[in-house]
Curated annotation (Swiss-Prot):
EC number: 1.1.1.130
Gene3D superfamilies: 1.10.1530.10, Hypothetical oxidoreductase yiak, domain 2 (3.30.1370.60), Hypothetical oxidoreductase yiak, domain 3 (3.30.60.50)
Organism superkingdom: Bacteria
Species assigned in the record: Haemophilus influenzae (strain ATCC 51907 / DSM 11121 / KW20 / Rd)
HAMAP family cross-referenced by the UniProt entry: Diketo_gul_reduc (MF_00820)
Protein name, per record: 2,3-diketo-L-gulonate reductase
InterPro entries attached to this UniProt entry: Diketo_gul_Rdtase, Mal/L-sulf/L-lact_DH-like_ah, Mal/L-sulf/L-lact_DH-like_NADP, Mal/L-sulfo/L-lacto_DH-like_sf, Malate/L-lactate_DH-like
UniProt family annotation: Belongs to the LDH2/MDH2 oxidoreductase family. DlgD subfamily.
Description of how the protein assembles with itself and partners: Homodimer.
Biological classification of the source: Bacteria, Pseudomonadati, Pseudomonadota, Gammaproteobacteria, Pasteurellales
Keywords: Cytoplasm, NAD, Oxidoreductase
GO MF entry, a single one: NAD+ binding
Signal sequence segment: none
Active site: H44
Membrane-spanning parts: none
């Protein structure tokens, strides 16, 4: 089924107002969730909303909290989110990183005591739309085994890198082959994952999303490489923010909150003139796109370029929503 932007936003806002959020905050939060869903990130938009409400009701999310600056070192700042709403706080932090980059050429914000930011790609895209390179990542609850282990000891720790091309080129990836949100998308669609997603109970690779959701044995992206990347991203976010690590969130909290995040903006126009920038970027993209296709019916993929098409389709034809997810939203 498909629903209109306003219909979806009104449902989000209704639920938020019922939880005593102010009119202004409910409007801002509902808009963020609707924008994410319309952009095609269903797993971190409407599908994630019930989980967001659960954490709101548990007190993990403090809706009226105001993030504060703790430390300033020129182009680097340290902030405390005080468990404010994750996606709204992340947007503010990338805005601040862009402000610093406009002054210093680069801006780095390290945030502690943050909540789940929903679609991390929104903040890289936010920077790239303004002509900046945007980089951000977050640590998370331990929901993935490190390479060589069965037990979950590392986070999926999503990493986003966005480049101001036309259209925007952006990598938005967890350190696992699939996030739990994308496993849910595949399960709801009644399909296997396109590549191996994790291990079954006997230690064999599997593409069955329901098995991996249940046993929590995600496959790290690139095997040991994704495992290693997750670990160092956690270390850096923890150090820069003076916040909680994956182990601290996992062992000291009763759910995923008080995570640590990093937002970086780079003003590339200080380093290269506009004409040269466009020529170099277009040459890279053209070189990639004109490679001989392995499947003649499938275009060579440039990361993030599909979102422009998805957004246009959803704006024209309505936003695709799984009927079961929609029914759940209506009961909240």
């Amino acid at each position: 089924m498909r629903v209109s932007y306003d219909e979806l936003k009104n449902e989000f806002k209704r639920v938020l107002l019922d939880r005593q959020l102010t009119e202004e905050l409910a409007e801002e939060c509902a808009t963020a969730f609707t924008d994410t869903t319309q952009a095609g990130a269903y797993s971190h938009g409407i599908n994630r909303f019930p989980r967001f409400i659960q954490q709101l009701e548990q007190g993990d999310i403090v809706p009226n909290a105001i993030p504060t600056k703790v430390l300033s070192l020129g182009s680097i700042e340290q902030w405390d989110a005080h468990q404010a709403i994750g996606n709204l706080t992340a947007k503010k932090m990338m805005d601040r990183a862009i402000e610093l980059a406009s002054q210093h050429g680069v801006g780095v914000i390290a945030l502690r005591n943050a909540n789940h930011w929903m679609r991390g790609g929104s903040y890289g895209w936010q920077a790239a739309e303004k002509g900046y390179i945007g980089i951000c990542w977050t640590n998370a609850l331990a929901v993935m085994p490190p390479w060589g282990a069965k037990e979950c000891r590392i986070g999926t720790n999503p990493l986003i890198i966005a480049v101001p091309t036309t259209p925007i080129t952006m990598v938005d990836m967890s350190c696992s082959m699939y996030s739990y949100g994308m496993l849910e998308v595949h399960r709801l669609a009644g399909r296997q994952t396109f590549v191996d997603a994790g291990f079954d109970d006997e230690g064999n690779l599997t593409r069955d999303p329901s098995i991996v959701e249940k046993n929590r044995r995600l496959l790290p992206m690139g095997f040991w490489k994704g495992s290693g990347l997750s670990i160092v991203l956690d270390m850096i976010a923890t150090l820069l923010s003076n916040g909680e690590s994956t182990v601290a969130v996992t062992e000291d909290k009763n759910d995923e909150y008080c995570v640590s995040q990093v937002f970086i903006a780079i003003e590339v126009d200080r380093l290269i003139d506009g004409k040269s920038k466009d020529e170099k970027l277009n040459r890279i993209m053209d070189y990639v796109k004109t490679a001989e296709r392995s499947d003649p019916t499938q275009a060579v993929r440039l990361p993030g370029h599909e979102f422009t098409t998805i957004l246009s389709d959803n704006q024209t034809n309505g936003i695709p929503v799984d009927e079961r997810v929609w029914a759940k939203l209506k009961t909240l």
